[in-house]
């Protein structure tokens, strides 16, 4: 390294003397020619041929100067380094060292560039591209003592927005930078040259994030632009609630987003893991539209009003009113896989609503209305003595050819009034899929947990239209010493109704898997409804009355268990032949 540096310095001194001689000749004659200056010189029997080209750009006040030097020697062991240095400070010190033959040293930043042309033995030198606020055109004579030469103020490297580029005509380049606030690029200067680009950027830690608007009363409106490649924001906190929302815009771009939204003092924390995999040919339109309006009022002895109208996505809402002893966690894994050819339109619209109350009086209410999606309900740690976690995977797989239209639509309107001695009125109107409803009014120390996985599999060819429609009207009155009235009107559905009366300190867990499979060819119109699962956990002296009117309902299972002082687990699987295991 030292020998190379000494060689470069000696070469610079020789070129400086030659430049001084040419400057004196230029001063006597007026000015050198503007295109290029050629000067042959000799050293130790070797012939050097120097050529300088200047190139000006006209974009944004920037300019580029290209210096190309051809060294016609046969000794390939010689290397030439071009070192760039602060030319303004050097120009103030002495004017005779403004242009040191195109090889410039940058002692502040310690940048080195090495150029080798292994094909013909020619060494190609550097280009410094200064991108500043002013356009400096430089001079055509490098040895003029006037301060406006290319080595003057135009090539200052003290500015923070200075961008220096090395334009290399050869095959390789080495550039070492010891500064973290400088940009180095290498680009090809001509059309037939090789382009090597190296760029180092120091940014103030900016990340691409989605837009989330949060208000005090629980109004949420999430707008996600899916043109971003990947958006990830992770925050760790000890808040006991989890909530997430994943929405896709109506574009053919699929994005996986992992977000944790942490609120202050509201005990909301969101986490979602969703994977949408679509394999197919000529999928013309795949849309995920969604809209949501929520209004929630949660007080100790007051009512809770919740309205949810959504058209698509996977949406989980969790609300807790906790006196410091409960923990709630919801995790959704959803996979929608579509394998098919020539699928013209596939749309998924779903909504899911969960509302939870965990007070000292132990009231917990959960309702999920979803369409082609997943509703997960979990309540954990009542009075600090129990903990439950439910993970519900749901897979909707559609295999088919030439499926023209598959639509899932749902709408939900909910109004709830939850008091200690008052009634509970709940109305749900939904159009098609899984409806999970759970209400708890517990005066003791019990816990209820409902898990319903659902799988919808559709296998068919040339399925023109598949629609799922259902309607349900519910009215419930849950009082301390009163009765429970439930009315369910459904069409072509599978309805599960379970009522359990627990007086003591029991814990009940009831998973209800439901599988609906449709298969056929040329199915023009199919209508059906998934399960509406309702569970009421009452205390002491409560009566249950169910009225169900359905045209094609089947597979009704009622299971009652009463266990005191222990945790009881009931697993109920409802399939085609209804096997029950406890």
From Swiss-Prot:
InterPro entries according to UniProt: Semenogelin (IPR008836)
Comp. bias intervals (Basic and acidic residues): 292-310, 335-345, 413-426, 456-465, 533-552, 559-582
Location within or outside the cell: Secreted
First and last residues of every Sequence repeat: 70-129, 141-200, 201-260, 501-559
Glycosylated sites: 272
Main localization (coarse): secreted
Function: Participates in the formation of a gel matrix (sperm coagulum) entrapping the accessory gland secretions and ejaculated spermatozoa.
Name the record gives this protein: Semenogelin-2
Organism: Homo sapiens
Gene it is expressed from: SEMG2
């Amino acid at each position: 390294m030292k020998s190379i540096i000494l060689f470069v310095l000696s070469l610079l001194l020789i070129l400086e003397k030659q430049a001084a001689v040419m400057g004196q000749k230029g001063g006597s004659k007026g000015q050198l020619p503007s295109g290029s200056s050629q000067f042959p010189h000799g050293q130790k029997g070797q012939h050097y041929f120097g050529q300088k080209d200047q190139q000006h750009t006209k974009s944004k006040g920037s300019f580029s100067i290209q210096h190309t030097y051809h060294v016609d020697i046969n000794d390939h062991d010689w290397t030439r380094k071009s070192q760039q240095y602060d030319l303004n400070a050097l120009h103030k010190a002495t004017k005779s060292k403004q242009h040191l033959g195109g090889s410039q040293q940058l002692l502040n930043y310690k940048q080195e560039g090495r150029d080798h042309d292994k094909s013909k033995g020619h060494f190609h030198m550097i280009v410094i591209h200064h991108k500043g606020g002013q356009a400096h055109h430089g001079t055509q004579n490098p040895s003029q003592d006037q301060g406006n030469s290319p080595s003057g103020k135009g090539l200052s490297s003290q500015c923070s927005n200075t961008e220096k580029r090395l334009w290399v005509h050869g095959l390789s380049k080495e550039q070492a930078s010891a500064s973290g606030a400088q940009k180095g690029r290498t680009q090809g200067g001509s059309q037939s040259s090789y382009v090597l680009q190296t760029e180092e950027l120091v940014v103030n830690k900016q990340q691409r994030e989605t837009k989330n608007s949060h208000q005090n009363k629980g109004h949420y409106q999430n707008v996600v632009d899916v043109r971003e490649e990947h958006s990830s924001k992770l925050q760790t906190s000890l808040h006991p609630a989890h909530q997430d929302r994943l929405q896709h815009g109506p574009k053919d771009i699929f994005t996986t987003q992992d977000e944790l939204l942490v609120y202050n003092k509201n005990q909301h924390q969101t986490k979602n893991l969703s994977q949408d995999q679509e394999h197919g040919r000529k999928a013309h339109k795949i849309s995920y539209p969604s809209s949501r309006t929520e209004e929630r009022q949660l007080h100790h002895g007051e009512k809770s009003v919740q309205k949810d109208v959504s058209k698509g996505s996977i949406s989980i809402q969790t609300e807790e009113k906790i006196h410091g002893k409960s923990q709630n966690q919801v995790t959704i894994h959803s996979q929608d896989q579509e394998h098919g050819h020539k699928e013209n339109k596939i749309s998924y619209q779903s909504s899911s609503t969960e509302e939870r109350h965990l007070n000292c009086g132990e009231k917990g209410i959960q309702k999920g209305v979803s369409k082609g999606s997943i509703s997960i309900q979990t309540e954990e740690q009542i009075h600090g003595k129990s903990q439950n976690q439910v993970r519900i995977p749901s897979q909707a797989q559609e295999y088919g050819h030439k499926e023209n239209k598959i639509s899932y639509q749902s709408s939900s309107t909910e109004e709830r009034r939850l008091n200690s001695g008052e009634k509970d009125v709940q109305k749900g109107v939904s159009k098609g899929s899984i409806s999970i409803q759970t209400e708890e009014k517990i005066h003791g120390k019990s816990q209820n947990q409902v898990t319903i996985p659902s799988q919808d599999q559709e296998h068919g060819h040339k399925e023109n239209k598949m629609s799922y429609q259902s309607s349900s009207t519910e009215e419930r009155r849950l009082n301390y010493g009163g009765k429970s009235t439930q009315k369910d009107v459904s069409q072509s559905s599978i309805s599960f109704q379970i009522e359990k009366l627990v007086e003591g300190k029991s814990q009940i867990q009831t998973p209800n898997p439901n599988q609906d499979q449709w298969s056929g060819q040329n199915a023009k119109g199919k209508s059906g409804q998934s399960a509406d699962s309702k569970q009421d956990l009452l205390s002491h002296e409560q009566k249950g009355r169910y009225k169900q009117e359905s045209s094609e309902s089947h597979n009704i299972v009622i299971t009652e268990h009463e266990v005191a002082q222990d945790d009881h687990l009931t697993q109920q699987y409802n399939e085609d032949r209804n096997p029950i295991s406890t």
